[in-house]
């Protein structure tokens, strides 16, 4: 259980650490903010590609082995990023890191499941993963100011090494022993995946660009990091809370409330009003996006008890695809007169539109 929480929490730092440092990295590499968005895209290309192989590998060989491979990839990739060898090598390094972050999410959650964790503990795992991303948004900007542009990378490598300790101590966990039937075309899983995309996926897109949005509105890097970090960081509270509520509130109602709340929070950010209004928007978006995590993944595992790891992977892959496509597109919005606000208006609309697949999802 501890190993799963460590793997999920430490390696999801990589999801938002670059977005938190977007402006300094743009200056260092001599590229636009939209190009910096490609560093996140490079990560999520491999993060997406490894989802199903990691899930099937966890089902067949055990989640501990997959987790250790993920940790090794994160360390190697961030070591490459620490080299000052240009933007092209940075893209390669982020792609290697993506193998680690993608496999880590699946393996970490499956470690919790294999250890006997139900909806409440899986919600706690979700909170741990949000902690990593949220803390990166809050800590990396001032740490970069105090040190250098390398801050996102050396911190990520150190956290990956930290996650290795409890993972190496895991023993005796049950595993499925086979990869299960192929889940890619499972029509019952896809609506569940759409809900994960509309909550976690869009929240990560928003979290990656909230800091530069607020900086362009006049906030300091520290204030923007603290406010923008709320989008991911407050999931520490609502993901476990959603797990506790899973047995007390109808899953469909819980997810509907989350979608409406996320849409409202993104809309507040899109308005470009006073800093306090944008901060409230970040808070509301983060609280809402974290709420349905346990409901969504518990439903995925119930749908495919023959391949729980692969089911986790497919549902999360839907969110990763959203991040992969949405992050660079959101970056392009910063080249428009709206200074990025248009991206958050679209996020608000997409969150609300997910009420449609909610009707088809078996929760």
Placement of each model-derived feature along the sequence:
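Cytoplasmic helix-loop-helix junction between adjacent transmembrane helices
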Residues: 93-129
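Helix-to-loop junctions at the C-terminal end of transmembrane segments
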Residues: 50-62, 238-250, 334-335
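Helix-breaking motifs and short loop linkers at transmembrane-helix boundaries and internal kinks
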Residues: 30, 62, 83-88, 272-273
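Helix-loop-helix hairpin linking two adjacent transmembrane segments in secondary transporters
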Residues: 89, 117-118, 123-171
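Conserved MFS/SLC helix-loop-helix module at the cytosolic interface between two early adjacent transmembrane helices
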Residues: 49-85
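C-terminal transmembrane helical hairpin of 12-TM major facilitator-type secondary transporters
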Residues: 250-296
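Extracytoplasmic gate region of multi-pass secondary transporters
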Residues: 18-19, 188-236
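A late C-terminal transmembrane helix in Major Facilitator Superfamily
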Residues: 306-339
